[in-house]
């Protein structure tokens, strides 16, 4: 029995909790995303993520984008870990009362 999640929502939630990138398609592009938070907006599920690569190319600059989960085709976990981006602001108003799961900074010993 596989321990990997199946379906878009469980896959994205696992990626956020484990801080692992996902491969997916978005607007016909093949993307590698580092999802930081899943939340609801107007009754729809969104993830905010950093694009690590688009169609095999590195982005010119780091950007935190919002992606409607229904628009992400076949998200799959990769073994690639990511660091929490400085662009992610967990206290941002758009996440207030709507966050379902978010990355957590590692505890400092």
Where are these regions (language model features)?
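Core beta-strand-centered patch of the WYL/Sm-like small regulatory domain
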Residues: 2-109
């Amino acid at each position: 029995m596989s321990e990997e999640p199946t379906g878009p929502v469980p896959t994205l939630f696992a990626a956020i909790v484990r801080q692992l990138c996902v491969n997916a398609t978005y607007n016909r592009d093949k993307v590698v995303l580092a999802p930081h938070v899943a939340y609801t907006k107007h009754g729809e599920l969104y993830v905010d993520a950093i694009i690590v690569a688009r169609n095999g190319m590195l982005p010119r600059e780091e950007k935190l984008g919002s992606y409607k989960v229904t628009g992400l085709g076949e998200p799959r976990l990769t073994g690639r870990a990511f660091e929490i981006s400085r662009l992610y602001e967990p206290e941002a108003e758009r996440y207030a009362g709507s966050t379902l799961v978010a990355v957590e900074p590692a505890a400092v010993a």
